[in-house]
Amino acid sequence: MTEQIKVSEVSSILRQQLEGIHTSIKLEEVGTVLQVSDGVARIYGLDNAEANELLQFDNGMEAIVMNLEEDNVGAVLLGPTDQIKEGDTVKRTGRIASIDVSEGMIGRVIDPLGNPIDGKGEILGETCEMPLERKAPGVIFRQPVNEPLQTGIKAVDAMIPIGRGQRELIIGDRQTGKTSIAIDTIINQRSNYEAGNPVYCIYVAIGQKGSTVAALVNTLQEKGAMDYTIVVSATASDPAAMQYFAPFAGAAIGEYFRDSGRHALVVYDDLSKQAVAYREVSLILRRPSGREAYPGDIFYLHSRLLERAAKIINQPEVAREMNDLPESMRDKVKGGGSLTALPIIETQAGDVSAYIPTNVISITDGQIFLETDLFNQGNRPAINVGISVSRVGGNAQLKAMKKVAGTLKIDQAQFRELESFSKFGGEMDAVTAFTIDKGQKNTQLLIQPQYSPMPVEEQISILYCGTQGLLKEVPLDKVHEFEARFLQELRTSHQRDVLDVLKTGVINDEIRGILEKTAKELWVH
């Protein structure tokens, strides 16, 4: 007799079997490469792709969407073009192009995607995902620039002061010492690092030779500056897209420190090469070209990058409401941080009225203009004080420096004018002769060797001698000898009562008296 099959049992067995089946389907949007050339791929089938979205090819290479057209998307490749061919499949990642930033990046050399390229292994530490492109903080979340960023360069700190949160352009022809000013500024932050209040430095090398970047990293290591510095490098052999995105990676790393209540300095060396890389990418993407074949939004490229430098309001509850804050940063936000930018632009034959230089001059808060003639005369740093300016740094300058060097810029301008007249010969009255003598000696005082930034208190001391005419008896060729002896005397005999007080920004009659007495005693014939 056959067993009767119960309907209830069958249904329960079927139910158990069906419950064990995984019916979830993972949907991935996949496209196909239609065409690839010169670092740009045209892809069909990614109808929902977003601008600046990261795409991934089968071989692991990544690309970033830049053009959204009716029937295809144009994406820039972040790797060699020859590794991608027509017909390859591409998938969306759903992520906007970003970089994973962590404390472990400090002291490392990375590419614009955050991958280490210094051969020291992977980067460790908790990471925060920071978007490469991000809106700058609104006016509500900023405060005025009021804290100095000491460069250690006498001519800059005295006449063209830079504040934390400022954008100061360094502009000049090739081989005039633009990078040297930026590197000296980074080296000068060593004292802040040792005092426990570091200014984290990000040096972005765009389109430079690999050997140049290696030599620069070596210099920073020798001076102990890599302890608080990150180098982002996109060399001349890297794809144009990497050179284009490198400054955005530097800004994203700087924002990580800025938004967590710390101070950062980012150097873009140089934005002329970024503009050329962007022009190359835009032309291959067949975007309409404008003046000098640059795309129409080249101004917006630099303005949106440099606007990200800011001094954040010192109220954490307000700072936490900052616009476009990445989710990974929400619980780390503190107020009072800053991001200072030093963009570098290379001019051709001193032409500051060219397209890209005028754009960046109008975006930044001032410029340091370097001249080939001054450089060749031995006036280094070769700063043309007449057309160099700092529009907001004056509010951040130390009071002692402002008192001592307040007239230095005008004095030097008058000296240059009188000097050009004196070349015609003829007799000079005593006042003119004194002005020229003082100007020549001040010019000598402002000359400074490379990689030897000077603490601000020593700058104030020696510039006091120059501006007050205390070098009247010192021969012109002995000014540097006097400077070395004078500063050595202050370090050995007046560290606490003069230098330490000047460091706080205070100068009084007692200190003035000591400085004048020391200068006179030092040069007694």
Curated annotation (Swiss-Prot):
ATP binds at residues 172-179. Keywords: ATP synthesis, ATP-binding, Cell inner membrane, Cell membrane, CF(1), Hydrogen ion transport, Ion transport, Membrane, Nucleotide-binding, Translocase, Transport. GO terms for molecular function: ADP binding; ATP binding; proton-transporting ATP synthase activity, rotational mechanism. Its main location: membrane. It is found in: Cell inner membrane. Its EC number is 7.1.2.2. Pfam families: ATP-synt_ab, ATP-synt_ab_C, ATP-synt_ab_N. This is ATP synthase subunit alpha. It comes from Parabacteroides distasonis (strain ATCC 8503 / DSM 20701 / CIP 104284 / JCM 5825 / NCTC 11152). The gene is atpA.
